[in-house]
Amino acid sequence: DVKRFTRMLLECNNNDKLCVVREYQTEVIVVPVLLVGFFVIVLTVILWLHCRGLRAKQEQSSASGHQVNDKNLQESSSTENRYIQLSETPVESLLNSASLNLKELEILREKLSPGTLQLIKHGRCGSIYRAQLETGNPGKMKTVVVKALQDLASPQEVKDFLGRIKFHQNLGHHENLVELVGCCVDQLPLYMIMEDVSLGDLLTFLWTCRKDVMTMDGIPYDLTERQVYEVGQQVAAALAYLEQKKLFHGDIAARNVLLHHNFTAKLCGLGLAYETHAYGANSVTQIVPVKWQAPERLLKKPPSIKADIWSFGILLYEMITLGAPPYPEVTPSDILSYLQRQNIMKQPSSCQKAMYGIMKSCWQWNATDRPSPADLIRSLQTAIKTSKDHAVLQVPEPVVPELYARVAGVDVHSLVREYTVL
């Protein structure tokens, strides 16, 4: 039988007498075939057992993972980035985990009149509203701006939202900074309540001055050189206050200055200051347009208040030109090489020598050569004495936002806004 099987493997005809299979040839042919077959069977069994073991481990890991998450969400390292419904998480535990005690800022939700809620814009993590807040005096209401954290948010976003409230609380009150009124963190949704700055941002105001005479508190209003100095002094005072707090702003620009009644300037846009304070300069995610940045920031060096002084010079340029984009002849991608060649902006036709001198002092390449906020205030106070208070600044050309955004290197959508929270 073995020989017959061997003849078949050799494809020998049964009648072929020349095909003779000797005993040793049978061993050479049959034994390897049997070994190969045995090896294939063993390999198949091993693979089957391995796959079965992997499947069992995955099922066990999945089951244990669900048990851990059901028992305690905070014990899992993955919950930091996993999105959850805030309605399923006690707000008190979120406050405890963030180690924030905000009870002294708490405002009763009933004091926010729901019938007065007006949507301003949809933010990245929630909506921003304008509302009326009861002041405690019968019949007297105060207009405020409410930033609400969306119900669907990650634990990190909740921690960040609460951190911004705490940051503003620690910052304290200054007449030239947008003020935190209070918060609602006793239940969902979480609210951050800020003062309402009625006249909007300075950049829009400057553009409107090009079109027509502004009206402020019912009185026709436009812009003079002296008023540019007045706004400059108020922004410099806010910078001096930030310097005392060992902070820097990071994005000084007309778009981040709000105008209140009586022409009071309020510096806003403190998001970068918060991120730097909370997470460090290397972890900042906010993007600042390059044409407002000091050279050291473009070179990725550690920021300081002296970088804000450079940007302050750009702010003066914006005001005296009624909102013209800086470096109009330079593309945003070429701005660093332009500055490295020791170039600065030329004196605008509407700018007097004294103001341009202050601008140039702000644009010193070496940060140590620039004035401090206190020095800046003194220079502005000296220059305002000889400034013009009757000649109205006039720029006949209206601004096209899309063209401005392209030249200035900013997002055109960021220019259309009524309010900035932090």
Q: Residue spans of the language-model regions?
A:
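Glycine-rich ATP phosphate-binding loop
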Residues: 126-151
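Short beta-strand micro-motifs within the conserved protein kinase catalytic domain, predominantly
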Residues: 179-190
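Activation segment of protein kinase catalytic domains, centered on the conserved DFG
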Residues: 210-231
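Terminal C-lobe "cap" of eukaryotic-type protein kinase domains
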Residues: 365-368, 375-390
